[in-house]
Amino acid sequence: MAWKYTRRLEPLLDCVCDHDIGFQINCSYGNALRLTGDSTTVVPVYVAAAHKLADRFSPQAGVIKSWNFLRNDWVYPVIIDNMMNLELLTVGARLSGESALADIAGSHASTTLANHFRDDWTSWHLLDYDPENGSVRYRETVQGYAHGSAWSRGQAWALYGYTMMFRETGKEGYLEAAMNIGDM
């Protein structure tokens, strides 16, 4: 039964609308691989999804675009939720042997760390980047109480994302970030 519903997610590989493929495939196919060890069925879909997410990456900005829809004059919106998608790239790199996928995850995590957080380790929900030169056009909180407030769900995404990036890379800066985010 689980395979029946998991396989229904394969059409997501044709969607180019947002970053959610990371949540959707890692939570389904990632767990399928962990629970069944069926690399023949799982790995091709998992790696294809990692490539689909990687296609949303701007080397100039160093981050993965979250949404294609543009409102509020957005050009290249990146939301903190995207930290939850990086595991698709790191595991995809391990499964495929393609280190470029892990490099994209590292770039996104490091750029997000540099730009998304206030001095008190609360994060903005959304940053809009200039994809040509990587500059931050503006910061806002689309979900949450106010632009300057902490948004608990976003904090949770960041905490998980940096903990996972430490696990995957061993880089102490990611662990320190996770601890600071958790202590905010």
Regions found by a protein language model. Give the residues of each.
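Glycan-recognition and catalytic cores of secretory/periplasmic carbohydrate-active enzymes
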Residues: 1-184
